[in-house]
Amino acid sequence: MPRKKQTSPKEVTPALLKFREKRKWQINYRRYVLEESPCPFYAPYFGLDIKNLRQWFEYQFTGDLRWDNFGKKWQFDHVIPVTYFDFANEEELKMCWNFTNIRVEKFQLNKDRGNRLDVLNAKNYFKELLEKTNYAVCLKLLSKIDEIEVSDFVNTEAQQ
């Protein structure tokens, strides 16, 4: 019987590398929050220790949302989606994975938000948080939204 040919490994493209990097961060974030597993490398990017980060999410629980139904009834959601951040830039990583940029999102049927940024809601959210807390990361995230808006405007103009 002839040997089965091995399939060649996936070609390593910049997009694949970016996907793998994002996935690595997502996995470590879940381990940190859900499994309460300390991670000295990633923890500084999250902005809070495990106990306080879990409380941050618990404040957002509504109705029947609980830790034991993560992945079934709710998930973590980035206010500014991950795709807008450059993982090669340390400051961008700190903004992307900061607790203020991640919230509880209840699963909804037929919802397909994808990687779109709801600019108005995101701006209002970070402005309100900045006013209440004076937390500097909120100001940086507001600047990031402005940067995204300018970039989207330039791209739209270039297409016309």
Model-derived regions: residue spans:
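Contiguous alpha-helical segments
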Residues: 1-70, 75
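Extended charged
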Residues: 1-12, 16, 71, 123-160
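A generic "cationic amphipathic patch" detector
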Residues: 40, 70, 89, 115-119
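General structural signal for secondary-structure boundaries
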Residues: 48-49, 61, 91, 106-107, ...
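Histidine-centered catalytic micro-motifs used for acid/base chemistry in nuclease
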Residues: 56-90, 102-107
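Immediate flanking context of iron-sulfur cluster ligation sites
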Residues: 91-97
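Short Cys/His-centered divalent metal-binding micro-motifs
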Residues: 98-130
